[in-house]
Every structure is written in C-alpha cells, then in structure tokens.
C-alpha cells in the first residue's frame, strides 16, 4: 500500500521527538548503573503507571487479541484477563515489599532471601534464564508482529523491517537507559491510545461494516461477542474460564504478570519514590490494562471477521506476505490498511510507539539482569560504574540481535503465548509464598524451574502428547497445563522438605528489611514480633476483592456500552463505583497514600 506524505510527516515527527528525548537524558543516564537501570529511584506513581501501560501495549498484543477473538471469541480473552488477580496481588501485597527491599533488580532478591552457593547460583542462572532466554522469546514475538505489520502495511521484507526497527530502538535504548524509556512511554501512551481508539472507530463505521449494531449482528460475528464462554459447552467453559481462574493466574510466570511481582513491572516499582508510589503505579496500570485498553483491539478483531472471514481471504488480499507468516493474527494489520490518510499515519506512529516502548523496556530490563546479577556477581565483582553501563549497552545490542533472529523463525503470536505460559507453569506459587513462608529455600525454586521447563517441553513433543492428551488419549487437551502445574508443585514441595532450610541469620535479615509479617515467619522471629509488626495481608486481600469487582465491572460495562446495552452497562458501572468507594475507605488500613 502507498503511504501518503502526511502520514510520513506524522511518523517522522514522532520518531524525531522520541530520539530527542533519548538524547536529552543520555548524559544523566550514563552516570552510573542506578541511573541507567532505575533512574535514581525517584519516579512518581503516575509516570511509572503510564509507563507500565505503554510498555504492555506492544505490537504483538493487538495481533494476539485478534488471534484469540477470531478463534475463541471475546470470551477467549479470559486467558489473559485472569491475570488481573495476579496484578492486584502485586498492587496490594507485594508492591510495598519490593520497594522496601531496595534491590536494584528483582533477581538480586535471591541473595537477600536465600543463602550460600545455591543462592548465588540461582541468582546468576535466573538472570540468564529470564533476562536472556525468556526475554528473547518475548521480544521475538513482538518483532514477529512488527514483521507482519511491515509486510502488510509497508511492503517491507522481514529483514528490512527488523533492520529499520532495530537501529532506531537499540539506538534509543542504549542512549537513554531506563529514564529515557519511562519519559518516552509518557508520550507513547497518548499516541498509542489515540491510534487504537481512532482505528477502531473508523473501521467499525466503514461501509463494509455498517456500524456497531450491524457488526455485532453479522453472522460471522454474532456468536463471538459474548464476554463469557458458553456455559452449556463444558469443554469450552473449562478451557476458557475454569482453568485460567482456578489454576493459571497463580501458577504461571508470564512477563508483565508475574505472581508476586517481578520483571519489568518490578523494575518500575523499584524505581518509585517510595512504597506508596509503587502501589499507586501498579493500581493505575491494572485499571487501564484490563478495564479500558482491550476494547479497541477487540472491535477491530470482530470487524476483521466481516472483511477477512478466513486466512484464505487474507492471503488473497496480500499475496506478497510469506506463507510462513500467515495466520489469524495478521488480520489486525490487514484491517489497518483500510484507514484514511492522516489517521493511518497516527496509527502507524502508535504501532511504532508500541514496538519501541516494549522492546526498549525488555532490552533495559534484560540488560539490568545481565549487568547486576550476572556480570558483577559472577564475572567482575569490582566493575566500575562506567564498565557496568558499557556492558549494559553491549547487552542491549546482543539481546536485540538474538530476538530478531528468533522473530524470523516464528509464525504465530498465540502459539508463542501458550508456550511461554506453559514453560513457567507451576513456579508461580513459590513466588507468592517465598515472602511469607520461611521454609521455602533456593532448592525449591531451582527444582521448580527445571521441572516446569522439562515437563512442558515433554508434553509438547508429539510422541508424548499424542498418548497423554487429546480426544483419543488419556486426558483432554486442556489438562496439559494443569498437569505441568501439578507435577512441578509436587516436586518442589518434596524438594523443600528434603533439603535444609536457609541460614537463620539470612532469614532474620530479610525479615527485618522487608517486614512481610504473618504466621509463616513465627518460627524465625517469634510470636511476639509477629504480633508487634502486624500483618497487612488480610486488609490487602479485602482490597483485592473490591478492586476485582471494580475493574471487571468496568471491563464489562465498557463492553455492554459499546454493544448498545446501556441498562446493563449502567448497572455494572454503579457496582464499580460502589466497589471503588469501599476500596478507598479501607485505603488507610493498608497504609497507602498515593495522592
């Protein structure tokens, strides 16, 4: 397709502003590793919250949502909507603990909580496991989406897309560090929101669609609009709702939705002014991420079922797209080619914004692990601040090149999502309990990481999967994930009680620094100390329940409003307001003062 001059002006202007921000903050960011990775720990809640939202926009997210909606309907999004429980657990229980820990990365936590050689090994291994392996997988999926957008909208080859995107993003990331990422995220948030909303409004009202009512009553769409799965279809109900709600949210490690907090979300919490700002940032993120942001993508996905009802129709419209990249996730990019001049430039700028924001975050996050938790711990403990920053910049380049190579081999966003989800299945409960139960040790985590990875790979091998899972096998396909969780959990519990506990002095030091409280520490600090310190978790759980009601009601209220059912939308909005009122009534009980 041809891009008009106005669109190019919008895109180039945006890129120029972005690179200018990186250039302005580059001198300050290069002073030391704390500035480069955490911006001096002085960020306000609203800026960090917006950064969290912008970071998770990502070019692959609308593609993933489109893939889900076209295959499983709107209700299929429960596979990630359920992570709201994980997010709110981080908000009301873990955000202040992370900020009080005062670590540079969440991986540094390991040598604070555990002791001896196992702790040192776990810190170094986890740094490479998450910062390199998982990080490259995630970035590969993001770059895959960029390749598909480049092929459909700009007529670029995969190598051209990766080359152009890589030069701009890596240049920005190595210059500005974390501060550059966060400052640019503030701009990216508004550009990306405007682009996604504008695209959804225009595309739904195209003559081919005929408006929202014509869309939701179209034969290709009518059975896809429900926000809940069909309760009469047992298999669909179990797969789309029961397993995510009963098992997935607490058991799986997924970037941006880590049980107990972690990754680039933890990086932003650690950069906050104090624990109150850390909590405010994560609450704002969860409201925006789940209640409002998905709907523009969902509407475009539904509209794509009218214009491109199947993969064959996409292939017919875009014959230049390579066959190995064809899939339902391509429908989002295909729909964007229908946009008019001006709006197309804004949307392309928003997609570039999403790509740069997410990749920059992943690069800075991964580099922080490599520098703080591997290089300075395992290779060069006496490294100067300048050396740390230089290694961080070199790591940024290498991580991107590895993810770019992977992107050229990938084909589908949903397949990668499912694989990453299963690869970390069963480890989540450890990340939740390790703050509150003294008996968990380094071997608990080591065993869980290895068993989860090995079992998930085995279960995805055809020779094993065909025997255990499927219509004619021992168990239905949807039992694959719960079985990985069950096996992993049993193994790490056995290992925990079969290995000695951590050194008591280390446990006492950890408790005094973070003060998690609760009965799980009674054997270490004594009953009197537990009573004296108090325990905010019960109040936190109440806050979680109220916030769940508020955000899910806002999510559904927005959907019903779009569908034209104003009565149900109004009722849900009223319930959300009541939940919000009681949530802020108990605000002081969890010692949170954001404003």
Task: State what each model feature region is.
Residues 1-595:
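Membrane-embedded helix-loop-helix hairpins and adjacent transmembrane boundary segments
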């Amino acid at each position: 397709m041809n891009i008009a001059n106005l669109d190019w002006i919008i895109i180039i202007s945006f890129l120029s502003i972005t690179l200018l921000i990186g250039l302005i903050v580059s001198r300050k960011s290069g002073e030391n590793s704390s500035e480069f990775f955490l911006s001096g720990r002085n960020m306000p809640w609203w800026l960090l919250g917006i950064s969290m939202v912008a970071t998770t926009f990502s070019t692959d997210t609308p593609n993933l949502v489109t893939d889900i909606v076209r295959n499983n309907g709107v209700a299929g999004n429960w596979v990630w909507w359920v992570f709201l429980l994980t997010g709110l657990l981080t908000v009301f229980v873990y955000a202040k603990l992370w900020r009080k820990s005062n670590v540079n990365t969440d991986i540094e936590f390991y040598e604070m909580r555990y002791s001896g050689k196992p702790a040192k090994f776990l810190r170094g291994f986890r740094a490479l496991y998450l910062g390199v392996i998982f990080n490259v997988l995630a970035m590969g999926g993001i770059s895959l989406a960029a390749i598909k957008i480049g092929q459909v909208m700009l007529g670029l080859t995969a190598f051209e897309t990766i080359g152009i995107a890589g030069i701009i993003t890596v240049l920005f990331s190595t210059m500005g560090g974390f501060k550059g990422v966060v400052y640019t995220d503030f701009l990216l948030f508004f550009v990306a929101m405007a682009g996604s909303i504008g695209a959804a409004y225009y595309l739904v009202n195209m003559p081919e669609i005929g408006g929202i009512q014509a869309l939701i009553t179209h034969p290709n769409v009518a059975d896809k609009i429900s926000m809940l799965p069909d309760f009469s279809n047992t298999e669909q109900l179990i797969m789309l709702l029961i397993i995510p709600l009963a098992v997935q949210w607490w058991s799986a490690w997924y970037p941006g939705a880590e049980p107990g907090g972690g990754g680039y979300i933890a990086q932003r919490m650690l950069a906050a002014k104090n624990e109150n700002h850390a909590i405010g940032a994560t609450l704002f993120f969860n409201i925006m991420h789940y209640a409002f942001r998905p709907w523009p993508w969902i509407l475009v996905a539904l509209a794509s079922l009218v214009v491109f009802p199947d993969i064959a129709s996409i292939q017919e419209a875009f014959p230049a797209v390579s066959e190995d990249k064809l899939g339902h996730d391509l429908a989002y990019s295909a729909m964007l080619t229908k946009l008019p001049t001006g709006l197309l430039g804004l949307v392309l700028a928003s997609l570039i914004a999403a790509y740069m924001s997410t990749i920059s975050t992943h690069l800075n996050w991964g580099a922080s692990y490599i520098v703080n938790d591997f290089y300075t711990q395992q290779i060069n403990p006496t490294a100067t601040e300048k050396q740390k920053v230089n290694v961080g910049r070199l790591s940024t380049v290498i991580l991107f090149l590895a993810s770019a190579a992977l992107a050229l081999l990938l084909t589908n966003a949903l397949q990668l999502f499912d694989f990453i989800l299963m690869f970390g299945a069963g480890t989540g409960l450890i990340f939740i309990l390790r703050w509150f139960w003294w008996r968990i040790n380094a071997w608990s985590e080591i065993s869980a990481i290895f068993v989860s990875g090995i079992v998930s790979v085995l279960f995805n091998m055809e020779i094993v999967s065909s025997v255990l899972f499927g219509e004619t096998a021992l168990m239905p396909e949807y039992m694959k994930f719960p079985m990985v969780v069950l096996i992993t959990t049993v193994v790490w519990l056995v290992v925990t009680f079969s290995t000695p506990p951590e050194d008591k002095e280390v446990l006492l030091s950890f408790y005094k620094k973070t003060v998690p409280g609760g009965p799980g520490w009674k054997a270490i600090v004594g009953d009197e100390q537990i009573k004296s310190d108090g325990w905010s978790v019960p109040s936190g759980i109440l806050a979680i329940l109220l916030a769940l009601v508020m955000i899910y009601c806002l999510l559904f209220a927005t959907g019903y409003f779009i569908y034209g059912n104003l009565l149900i939308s109004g009722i849900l909005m009223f319930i959300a307001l009541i939940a919000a009122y009681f949530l802020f009534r108990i605000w002081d009980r969890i010692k949170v003062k954001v404003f």
